[in-house]
Amino acid sequence: MSAFELVTELSARFKDAVLGEQMTADRFPTVWIRPDATIDVHRFLRQEIDRPFKMLVDLWAIDETARKHRDGLPPSGITIASHLMSHERNADIRIKIALDAEYPRAKSIGSVFPNAPWYEREAYDMFGVEFEAQPHSLRILLPPGWEGHPMRKTQPGRATERPLFNMTASLFDAKEHALAADPEKFGLPTHRDGVELMILNYGPHSMATHGVFRIVLALDGEEIVAARPDIGFHHRGAEKMAERQTWHNFLPYTDRVDYLGGVMGEMPYLQAVEKACGIKVPDRALTVRIMLSEMFRIMNHLLFYGTMAQDTGAMSPVFYMFTDRERGYRVIESITGARMHPGFFRIGGLSMDLPDGWDRLVREFLDWMPSRLDDYEGMVLRNEIFRARTKGIAAYDTAMALDWGVTGPGLRATGYAWDVRKARPYAGFENFDFEIPVGHAGDCYDRTVVRVEEIRQSLKIIRQCVDNMPSGPIKADHPLTTPPPRERMLHDIETMIHHFVSTSWGPVLPPGEYTGQVETVRGLTQFALISDGEPSSYRTRIRTPSFAHLQMISAVAPGMMVADLVAYLGSIDYVMSDVDR
């Protein structure tokens, strides 16, 4: 069924509830519906349609009050957009509802998609959207007591535009009290079978939480009865920052959404921007992008591998693997000039070409790693203690993974071979030979094995990049990407006008909505951009995999021991900046 046929079926099924289809540059349909049909439409798409849309990929809000270019769209003050995916169809659909700007209220789809509540809480936190049957009084990213909803267009975008903050003693006490582990506030039970449960703050400063993040636990002895993750300690307002930066200037910020993913964070953003401008990236630039992205996949997975072993009691592997990472970072630094946050990609290509001798450095790393991985297999994967601590622990199946929006290695460990690089090739991945590693049990052990095998596949991809690196330019010949050559500047004034506009105001993207999706180290990362014909983004929505993966803790953790929770958290491989943005 094509996208057109899907919209036709949806319109026939709900008649007056479908208000129309919005034309975008994306390959999937965007459909506006009446707010009172929200639950019915989502239930139809998830449960009743052939090859259903089982995963809620993302849900977010848009403040439409300052938007100028929205001809043909239903009147809306605040828009709620939900992005659904059908893996069987390899298709997406985006559903939008229009709300009042002053008092936005919507129906919760938590009864249809188990992972909707966190996204709805974020829409309340950032935009003030009230969801029926949703504990919206709990903020999710901002601290208790925060006044206002910062993503509204009436809210300032810089700290210097806000009133001076003064942490008085009384305010400090109030904030401390608000952060207390109150079981009623977190919806935790206090008794089981007549026995009082212990309420425990796990984090936010525990090494086992891998960042500033806490889980409020209800314990019966060492057994976890209920768990409520509490996030937001690392929130920096990345989406708000995008509205104050030009399309070019926001690029370095994308490195820091997942600060271990390096250039991978730049890929979905650039995909969307280049789609908006109709820019065709040269083959050499695409191949370098793939090579560096896979280098960062290896760097991340080595860090995961070592710390996962350490979390389960093995001290030596992490030191060996950090030695390997240092070798890899030397290669990355030699090519990009930086280690973790290169900011190396540009709209339409790269910031510079590969240096002399780059291929020798990369080949040395490729020759070094395979034997090291063989050694680590004996040290970790075949280690009896590691196997005992991870096999059968925190296991879930494919259906549960799709329910909670799990992507990346966490989904593939259940036996489901879904990888954006294969299913929806981008940047030229369709030209590369590699396999998708999968597990079968969906437990901590399989999640580890999948990532180890991904290192081997990344080495295979990088070797193909080195052996088949195209020649040619590293940037597209486009006014938004490259200053014009001197001979062209001397030929006509139009060239100088384009150059002046881009360098003084910043590039201006055509009005519209554009989406980029890539398979980053943790799973599906998606940038949904709205351009209003200005040098800056009107709305930048960043969908990160870690956000969805942490929400699932409340469903997986009950029944396991506290010690098993350490292994489970390590096997998720999340980064708190990726969660909190």
Curated annotation (Swiss-Prot):
Region NADH dehydrogenase I subunit C, annotated ranges: 1-172
Annotated region described as NADH dehydrogenase I subunit D, given as residue ranges: 196-581
Documented EC number(s): 7.1.1.-
Catalytic activity: a quinone + NADH + 5 H(+)(in) = a quinol + NAD(+) + 4 H(+)(out)
Pfam hit, one: Complex1_30kDa
SUPFAM superfamilies per the UniProt record, alphabetical: HydB/Nqo4-like, Nqo5-like
GO cellular component: NADH dehydrogenase complex; plasma membrane
PROSITE patterns named in the record: COMPLEX1_49K
Membrane-topology annotation of the record: Peripheral membrane protein
Keywords, comma-separated and alphabetical: Cell inner membrane, Cell membrane, Membrane, Multifunctional enzyme, NAD, Quinone, Translocase, Transport, Ubiquinone
Any one GO MF annotation of this record: NADH dehydrogenase (ubiquinone) activity
Subcellular compartments: Cell inner membrane
InterPro entries (alphabetical): NADH_DH_suCD (IPR023062), NADH_Q_OxRdtase_suD (IPR001135), NADH_quin_OxRdtase_su_C/D-like (IPR037232), NADH_UbQ_OxRdtase_30kDa_su (IPR001268), NADH_UbQ_OxRdtase_49kDa_CS (IPR014029), NDH1_su_D/H (IPR022885), NiFe-Hase_large (IPR029014)
Tree of life domain: Bacteria
Quaternary context: NDH-1 is composed of 13 different subunits. Subunits NuoB, CD, E, F, and G constitute the peripheral sector of the complex.
HAMAP family: NDH1_NuoCD_1, NDH1_NuoD
Reported function: NDH-1 shuttles electrons from NADH, via FMN and iron-sulfur (Fe-S) centers, to quinones in the respiratory chain. The immediate electron acceptor for the enzyme in this species is believed to be ubiquinone. Couples the redox reaction to proton translocation (for every two electrons transferred, four hydrogen ions are translocated across the cytoplasmic membrane), and thus conserves the redox energy in a proton gradient.
Recorded family membership: In the N-terminal section; belongs to the complex I 30 kDa subunit family. In the C-terminal section; belongs to the complex I 49 kDa subunit family.
Identification of the protein by name: NADH-quinone oxidoreductase subunit C/D
